[in-house]
Amino acid sequence: MSTEQLPPDLRRVHMVGIGGAGMSGIARILLDRGGLVSGSDAKESRGVHALRARGALIRIGHDASSLDLLPGGATAVVTTHAAIPKTNPELVEARRRGIPVVLRPAVLAKLMAGRTTLMVTGTHGKTTTTSMLIVALQHCGLDPSFAVGGELGEAGTNAHHGSGDCFVAEADESDGSLLQYTPHVAVITNIESDHLDFYGSVEAYVAVFDSFVERIVPGGALVVCTDDPGGAALAQRATELGIRVLRYGSVPGETMAATLVSWQQQGVGAVAHIRLASELATAQGPRVMRLSVPGRHMALNALGALLAAVQIGAPADEVLDGLAGFEGVRRRFELVGTCGVGKASVRVFDDYAHHPTEISATLAAARMVLEQGDGGRCMVVFQPHLYSRTKAFAAEFGRALNAADEVFVLDVYGAREQPLAGVSGASVAEHVTVPMRYVPDFSAVAQQVAAAASPGDVIVTMGAGDVTLLGPEILTALRVRANRSAPGRPGVLG
């Protein structure tokens, strides 16, 4: 495609931290639209490899000379967020040369210009709800452009430049950057306390959602889950401002646009009965909504996606058909594999949950999977994410993890943060009352988990850090154990 489709300052872009979920998506869209892209990252990753295969020039490590990877040099340097150290040599060199340094949200806003924008935000469920919306619109033949914080199972990518006139994106609320956007349709899944390291107070965090809603374009709509107290309160405030609000949830009422009437787990999927407001559907009465992903929270996410899709003209029944084919998002209760142990199998899942509410929802889904299986236990390997979050939610993490039968707590994955005195995985472990092991030695965890597993168990690796690497290691250790106990028996099955 011609670079004429891109603003002049985005035709030759260098991206610092290009392999991350958000940055790699922007890079893909720039490449799809004919731009030249270079970048750097601290380490090799799936995202880095995929972008190289599409023509991006990427260097591991940070060096000022990386700005010259592209012929003619970069016209802009993009960073993930303001937390990138100002001493980063590439940013220092960009400023010395007078090359504009811009943040990812500003670039995404430019890429969405001129399109009907549908944006999903909230404390939990953003990535899954955004992905459901994308898959549903694709099924309806709309071919949306999209940028999402996870990898869609169906597409194997986190971003795409589509031929349609709509753009679907996940709006990150963690640092206020969602205020860069002016959506036509905004979906808010829920609002709970989080990211207090940036906002300083719950009140400030909640206020950013109000400000975001006020940026909805005239004639647009807010889609919000009112099962959540924070969402219900926001819906009321938005209504008072004259914003069109479409509420969804499980509590029926005259103001509800979509209601979850009933829901039943079926294997690793679910069947729900829903009711839509008369103005949203040609045929009245309960409808069946089938999903291939487990958990009541997934059914609510699907309702939000359904309402958003209908707002831009997608027929409700076609959207429901599309949602039935949604296969999930990488690292959202993703089945890593299965291993035969004794007379039953052990299933290993991986999940991105890093907030107490997310943990509770994921463990509820795991319980439902167990009820459909061989009656094993629920084992969790939890890695706290960020020292500030661990300090704020240590007790809540412990209480949420108590829904498991056995818990392995790792040390904190600090990411961008420096350690805080007195804060570690032990801060969480002391609040866990079910059988628990605190294992600060990351290299020792897989063997311990595999040794503790029993036939029929479900194991969930959980957190936003590198705990995701443990799933395959646990499966390998389980296979070795199975082969030792029954020579010649098949090991990992999936």
Swiss-Prot record:
Listed GO CC annotations: cytoplasm
A Pfam match: Mur_ligase
Enzyme class: ligase
Localization annotation: Cytoplasm
Residue numbers binding ATP: 122-128
Annotated catalysed reactions: UDP-N-acetyl-alpha-D-muramate + L-alanine + ATP = UDP-N-acetyl-alpha-D-muramoyl-L-alanine + ADP + phosphate + H(+)
Transmembrane residue ranges: none
BP terms from Gene Ontology: cell division; cell wall organization; peptidoglycan biosynthetic process; regulation of cell shape
Entry annotated with the keyword Magnesium: no
GO molecular function: ATP binding; UDP-N-acetylmuramate-L-alanine ligase activity
Top-rank taxon: Bacteria
Pathway: Cell wall biogenesis; peptidoglycan biosynthesis
Keywords, sorted A to Z: ATP-binding, Cell cycle, Cell division, Cell shape, Cell wall biogenesis/degradation, Cytoplasm, Ligase, Nucleotide-binding, Peptidoglycan synthesis
Enzyme Commission number(s) of this protein: 6.3.2.8
Family: Belongs to the MurCDEF family.
General function of this protein: Cell wall formation.
Protein name: UDP-N-acetylmuramate--L-alanine ligase
